Amino acid sequence: DVPEIKFHMEHPLMKRIVELKERNYADYGQYDYAPKDYEDAQENYDSLLEITGDINANIIGPNSEDVDAEGPHCENGRVRYASKTYENLDATIKAGLCGMTMPRRYGGLNLPNVVYTAANEIIAEGDAGFENIWSLQDCIETLYEFGDEDQRKRYIPRVCAGETMSMDLTEPDAGSDLQSVMLKATFDEKENCWRLNGVKR
């Protein structure tokens, strides 16, 4: 029901985006829910966004005040989320809302980023803090793009099954602002390795 989402989902470029992401529907018949054509894909996306909206309206949104009140805390030397955060995560995992952009061969949904971003927006409406946790699944994009096949097979299915990832920023002047990170990586051709240069806490 969000006009901005509807605008993007019905944009004329969406058909080409879907064809490219679906590799002209090459997964059809090999994986459950792999679309056979553009109309089938759009039907799948609409269903997925409706499920996301239901989870937001019935679980994530109603839990948000309790999550804020309890907050994360230290328990036996480990940081724990608020109990309702685990309820939110469980609901998204059971609904299959993990590994959304990853290929089906790793257990992902192979969604275009447009659809994943729409789901992000829906979840953020209920609890922006939880959306930050849930959307850490997109950290796996880096491994998918730059990792080797062994790494992909070891880690991507875990994220698609609902294991959470993290983004750890430890520079003194960056805080949680990823854009402020000053660490530089340069390739040392002589030693055939990457050198990191920056200040860490």
Please provide the spans of the model-predicted regions.
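Conserved beta-strand/loop block within the catalytic cores
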Residues: G77, A82-D90, V181-F187
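Internal helix-loop-helix
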Residues: G53-D54, K84-P157, A161
